[in-house]
Design a protein with these regions (language model features):
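Hydrophobic pocket/interface hotspot
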Residues: 26-36, 70, 81, 107-109, ...
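Low-complexity, charge- and small-residue-enriched intrinsically disordered regions
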Residues: 56-59, 63, 128-139, 170-185
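Beta-strand/loop substructures that line and gate deep hydrophobic ligand-binding cavities in soluble
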Residues: 85-137, 142-144, 148, 153-154
Length: 190
């Protein structure tokens, strides 16, 4: 009897922010991901994004329960992280930049994956709203880094704060190898 393929649920989630600056200026923010002075990821309020080495092909990292490896990297242009945990997330997330007229660049985050059956109820209920909030706060951080302010800052929801409190008990940063780029704030710094 033939084995039927496991059904999956596609997810494609994109966040974009038009920022002042050329490709190199805005693209430099990508280089700081997972570092001590990460200009994008809001590690002070969220489980930090960490990398187990330099920003390079093959470097592993994660945030919260997600674990991934850099599978595509173009300095100051693109970094793509392919998930390997949790197993129900099959795909990647990436940060990229593209020009948007004179003196402006779009910083984009894209999440493209297939959810296995276990992920169907888990991701939309427990993680999607958190994902949207952390990425928008990260884009706020990028805007603040470039301009000194944020025109329309994202306000975190109380429900997401409660979700983070519950999930934070289960998904602490467990440490990486000795060369890990650890954020200066958040659970990893403790």
């Amino acid at each position: 009897m033939p084995t039927l393929p496991m059904p999956t649920l596609p997810v494609h989630n994109v966040h974009r922010r038009r920022l002042p600056g050329d490709l190199d200026t805005v693209g430099a923010l990508i280089e700081g991901l997972g570092g001590a002075d990460d200009p994008i990821w809001p590690a002070h309020d969220w489980m930090p994004l960490w990398l187990d080495g330099p920003m390079a092909l093959g470097t592993t990292g994660g945030h919260g329960p997600a674990r991934y490896r850099i599978v595509s990297y173009q300095p100051r242009r693109l970094v793509r992280f392919r998930f390997h945990e949790p197993s129900f997330m099959i795909g990647f997330h990436e940060f990229s930049v593209e020009p948007d007229g004179p003196g402006h660049t779009v910083l984009q985050h894209a999440l493209t994956m297939q959810l296995g059956p276990v992920g169907w109820p888990v991701f939309p209920v427990a993680f999607l709203a958190l994902h949207n909030e952390v990425i928008e706060m990260g884009l706020d951080g990028a805007e603040r880094r470039l301009t000194g302010r944020v025109r329309r800052p994202v306000t975190g929801s109380r429900l997401n704060a409660a979700r983070r409190a519950v999930l934070g008990r289960y998904f602490e940063y467990t440490g990486a190898g000795p060369g890990a780029r650890r954020p200066s704030t958040g659970p990893a710094a403790r």
